[in-house]
Amino acid sequence: MSTEPLQEKLMKLSSLTSKMLRKNFGRGPDSCFGFVNGPFLVLYIRGFLSPMESVLLESGNLDNIDMSRTIVMNKVLNHLKGMLEIEFEIDVKSAYHDWNYNQNTGMIAIEFDRNIAGAFVNNEDTSILKNLINEVDRISIIVQKKPEMTDAFSISPKVYLVKREGILIEIEKSLIAKGYEETLMVTKDELEKSYLHHNGHFEEIFSRPVADIFVDWNFHADNSIMCFILKN
């Protein structure tokens, strides 16, 4: 693996990700910042809405934006995973992405199969992490069911991740098996984010305002990633 400092590596990866997005979407983001801790890499993206997407957003076609962007992002993530595995010499376990179109922000979260060298696991926020797990479980129960397992991670002072496993109920599994994965994804996205934003007590847990909440699912692995971005 390259011996360059981790922060320099993150800056390079953020730049390469921006170029990759520009190549595939016709424009790149205004900014892309990388954060790492343990086995996780999070890229926080701002200013990434194309003129066509802006028109669709104004006309209320959010679902069309989401589905078309997901198709292109699957290609981007495949290239990004290959680049990251070469750079860190670690296998990528899973990749997630989500977008807040109204705020023109987004995130890409990568989970490697082991800790990134130089990215030390932060265990200082144990009370915050415990309360975060409890709150995510509470909302998960309202929306669907309690996850079989929930873990929370502090990636940086302003970035937190929550990973849930065993989240799908039987009717959702049947819908996926019958080919309704995209429809289910859009529906879960709208429903869960509504509860997270309007029923969650996350600002009390963090003692700071929350700038963004992102959620993505891997239906085939039956897991989900949530990303909380805090305001400075």
State the predicted function of each range:
Residues 2-50, 54-58:
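N-terminal ordered "arm"
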Residues 35-52, 141-177:
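An N-terminal amphipathic alpha-helical segment
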Residues 71-115:
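Hydrophobic, ordered structural segments
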Residues 100-159:
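Surface-exposed beta-loop interaction hotspot
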Residues 200-232:
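Extended, charged low-complexity segments
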